[in-house]
Design a protein with these regions (language model features):
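Histidine-acidic metal/acid-base catalytic patches
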Residues: 1-149
Length: 149
């Protein structure tokens, strides 16, 4: 993500930005929320591909969003909200064994539930202070209080 942001700086055009793929961030060993924060803070987040995977280098599992890393998915969605992302969300999953319509419906429900949970976290008011203090237990207890989907 850092190298892609440098490219955005070099191109220096208002219509040149990035699409983040959660699964690709995971496979590259990145925290997807950190990547979203880096790109969002610079106003260069133009698209988001939502999926999940087991983070093996070179693998693109394309699993349902939040199915393997639910807390990372919640953190990612909360970061999108923090930076007022209002662009497109794409589900980049590969339903090889599943009914594709059923998987798509699940992805929509899961994304909506995570979005609502992130809104509750942000509305509670202490999320930014807890993360600034690096209070992991405080964040986990906050998630517990507002309800993890």
């Amino acid at each position: 993500t850092g190298a892609a942001l440098l490219l955005c700086d070099d191109v220096d055009r208002p219509n040149f930005g990035l699409t983040l793929d959660v699964g690709h961030c995971l496979a590259a060993g990145e925290n997807p929320a950190q990547s979203a924060a880096m790109v969002g803070a610079r106003g260069k987040l133009f698209g988001v591909q939502l999926n999940d995977g087991y983070t093996r280098l070179g693998a693109e599992d394309g699993l349902a969003f939040g199915s393997v890393h639910p807390l990372l998915a919640l953190e990612f969605v909360a970061t999108l909200q923090k930076y007022n992302y209002d662009g497109h969300l794409y589900f980049d999953t590969f339903p090889r064994n599943e009914d594709p319509v059923r998987e798509c419906e699940y992805n929509i429900r899961r994304c909506e539930a995570l979005w609502a949970a992130a809104e509750r976290l942000r509305a509670e008011g202490s999320l930014d202070a807890l993360t600034a203090r690096q209070d992991a237990m405080g964040v986990l207890e906050l998630i517990e209080r507002v309800g993890m989907p």
